[in-house]
Design a protein with these regions (language model features):
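Short, conserved beta-strand element in jelly-roll/cupin
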Residues: 47-62
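Short strand-coil-strand connectors
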Residues: 27, 65-67, 90
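A cytosolic small-molecule/anion-sensing beta-strand core signal
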Residues: 56-57, 72-73, 91
Length: 114
């Protein structure tokens, strides 16, 4: 089992004025830490994978396909693959990002049935 030092990653990104860093990657899963610091905008594009955000610190608004929801520490939000989404209304926002990648019948990410 690999321990993931989420807090150290969050602090490092905060000191660098924000950004994203992957802390785990395997064929079906990516986990990262994303830190947004105003006034820098969230410039995300839709992703190929389903995604879950878990708020570590801060608050803001997450808009998914035109619907907005307030997010605060301890809350989570699901973003389906391909959905337009972005964070707004934050001062400093830190989230854990979990990308769930599709597995084919052999367990390989992105594999398709024969």
């Amino acid at each position: 089992m690999n321990a993931l030092d989420i807090e150290a990653t969050r602090r490092r990104l905060e000191e660098a004025d924000g950004g994203y860093e992957t802390i785990h990657s395997s064929p079906g899963l990516e986990i990262g830490v994303y830190v947004l610091i105003a006034p820098e905008p969230d410039r995300q594009q839709p992703h190929e994978d389903d995604e879950v955000y878990v708020v570590l610190e801060g608050r803001g608004v997450l808009t998914i396909e035109g619907e907005s929801v307030d997010i605060v520490e301890g809350k989570a939000a699901f973003v389906p693959a391909g959905a337009d989404h972005c964070f707004t209304g934050y001062e400093a926002l830190s989230v854990i990002v979990v990308f769930a990648r599709a597995h084919g019948p052999t367990g390989d990410a992105g594999a398709t049935p024969s």
